[in-house]
From Swiss-Prot:
Protein name as annotated: Bifunctional purine biosynthesis protein PurH
Phylogenetic classification of the source organism: Bacteria, Pseudomonadati, Pseudomonadota, Gammaproteobacteria, Pseudomonadales
Similarity field: Belongs to the PurH family.
GO CC annotation: cytosol
SUPFAM superfamilies xref list: Cytidine deaminase-like, Methylglyoxal synthase-like
Keyword Transferase: yes
MF term (GO), any: IMP cyclohydrolase activity
Length: 535
């Protein structure tokens, strides 16, 4: 069994990095510790120009770089020095003049940055596929019993700390090894994804000839948290996040207080935050079981998020119990006080949490308080995944959204200006409600939400029941449907409860009948031409 605590010193290091963040300081510290440094190309020049006494790999191997730098470190004196097992291969290493290399600091050609550039063609991409780097990384990682491999600049400080303490322990080298294989796996996956989008039947030099989906799909996620259990107590679970941080999300949020997030907390918080991101003016979204149960938008001069919370809560006070609350503005102390005094809440998330709000919520130690930061107005493109038995469904993220200018009026009566505001609001909410989704709204407040029914008309009935139960007036409210009405019964039902305007995608074989039903009831109806199924 390997001794976990014995420290191995470093006498010789090879440094060759594309990302030179912190490398000069790292090399200087190594030199002060008496470490002999081997280096290549641009890294060697940087070190030499800044007074670090490094040996160029070509001088060390006696074999010059060739083929425009394609062959630099692929030499037995390099890989033998990395792969050689101390105490096993010493004789053969001595016979061939191979010196042991105890530490390898390497990161790889910037393939991702290269292919992200406009106009990047296949030859350019190919020249930015690192060969020597991954080979050294894998060699050092394989021989981690004797060699330390450093691929992240963030590890330089801890490596130096270990060396100053007498060397790196096996536990440290094992952790560095794991990071190295994660690094090369992500790198190769990125290359495979890119190459897998190229259609060889077309012009392989053209970015326009690329498919949207690669032949194999490779993506890397990093474990952020192991959870007590999954969706149910008998299921095990963990939370993995994308290796590269994107826009503000539940994955990037900082937890300021409260119990550890559960599996369901994460899923529901994501639903709440993504919904509230849809609104420009101050908004509050309350979610239960991944469905919005209350949403409201209130301008700053009319009460802002404090009033928005009151209205969102009023939609469905029963469902709000134990829910998730999201805001698109800084959470202030007054709003925080209203929440914790009124209801039991699992999670509160906002782009920023004021100190006053922190102080208020601190009295409720179990409440999870998350600060996610601001997000851009333009939503980033990305992928959504759905696991099925034996496979994975992959689709582009549903960033589609309409404005008032996109609406097509299909009835005799056009909606009023206030109805248009409410229709667009209700449509934004319906996008985040499980299908079949029906949302009743009035004055930019949800007054009834019907979610997840197999029949669209039943979702409409549930929305009306919810509104009545909450004591909210449906008369003069608008209705949003995430997909078209297959029959006129949905409109007939809306007319009975007093709905004045409807927003839906359109596209049914019976659109004419549905429009006629709206005209008969004096209901204004608009088509969006865009569906928002959510399963």
């Amino acid at each position: 069994m390997t001794d976990q605590t014995t420290r191995l010193p470093v006498r010789r290091a090879l440094i060759s990095v594309s990302d030179k963040t912190g490398i000069l300081e790292f090399a200087r510290e190594l030199q002060q510790l008496g470490v002999e440094i081997l280096s290549t190309g641009g890294t060697y020049k940087l070190l030499k120009d800044n007074g670090v006494n490094a040996v160029e790999v070509a001088d060390y191997t006696g074999f010059a770089e060739m083929m425009d730098g394609r062959v630099k470190t692929l030499h037995p004196k390099i890989h033998g020095g990395i792969l050689g097992r101390r105490g096993v291969d010493d004789a053969i290493m001595n016979e061939h003049g191979i010196k042991p290399i105890d530490l390898v600091a390497v990161n790889l050609y910037p393939f991702e940055a290269t292919i992200a550039k406009p106009g990047c063609d296949l030859p350019t991409a190919i020249e930015n596929i690192d060969i020597g780097g991954p080979t050294m990384v894998r060699s050092a990682a394989k021989n981690h019993k004797d060699v330390a491999i450093v691929v992240n600049a963030s590890d330089y400080a801890s490596v130096l700390e270990g060396l100053k303490a007498g060397g790196l322990t096996y536990a440290q080298r094992f952790d560095l090894m794991l990071k190295a294989f994660e690094h090369t796996a992500a790198y190769d996956g990125m290359i495979a994804n890119y190459m897998g989008t190229i259609d060889q039947a077309k012009d392989t030099l053209s970015t326009e000839a690329r498919s949207e989906f690669p032949r194999t799909f490779n993506s890397q996620f990093v474990k952020a948290q192991e959870m007590r259990y999954g969706e149910n107590p008998h299921q095990s679970a963990a939370f993995y996040v994308e290796a590269k941080k994107g826009e503000a999300s539940v994955s990037t949020a900082i937890q300021l207080q409260g119990k550890e997030l559960s599996f369901n907390n994460v899923a529901d918080t994501d639903a709440a935050l993504e919904c509230v991101k849809s609104f420009v003016k101050p908004a509050c979204v309350i979610v239960k079981h991944a469905n919005p149960c209350g949403v409201a938008v209130v301008p700053e001069d009319e009460g802002g998020i404090r009033k928005a919370y009151d209205l969102a809560y009023a939609t469905d006070t029963e469902s709000a119990f134990g829910g998730i609350i999201a805001f698109n503005r800084e959470l202030d102390g007054e709003t925080a006080k209203a929440i914790v005094e009124r209801q039991f809440v699992e999670v509160i998330i906002a782009p920023k949490i004021s100190q006053a709000a922190r102080d208020v919520v601190a009295a409720k130690q179990n409440v999870r308080l998350l600060e996610c930061g601001e997000w851009p107005a333009e939503r980033a493109a990305g992928w959504d995944f759905k696991r099925v038995n034996g496979g994975l469904l992959v689709q582009s993220r549903d960033n589609g959204m309409i404005t008032a200018e996109d609406l097509k009026i299909v009835t005799k009566r056009a909606p009023t200006e206030q109805e248009i505001h409410d229709l667009v609001f209700a449509w934004k909410v319906a996008k985040f409600v499980k299908s079949n989704a029906i949302v009743y709204a009035k004055q930019r407040q949800t007054i009834g939400v019907g979610a997840g029914q197999m029949s669209r008309v039943n979702s409409a009935r549930i929305a009306a029941i919810k509104a009545e139960h909450a004591g909210l007036q449906v008369q003069g409210a608008v209705m949003a449907s995430d997909a078209f009405f297959p029959f006129r019964d949905g409109i007939d039902n809306a007319a009975k409860v007093g709905i004045s305007a409807v927003i839906q995608p359109g596209g049914s074989m019976r659109d004419a009948e549905v429009i006629a039903a709206a005209d008969e009831a004096g209901i204004a109806m608009v088509f969006t031409g865009m569906r928002h199924f959510r399963h």
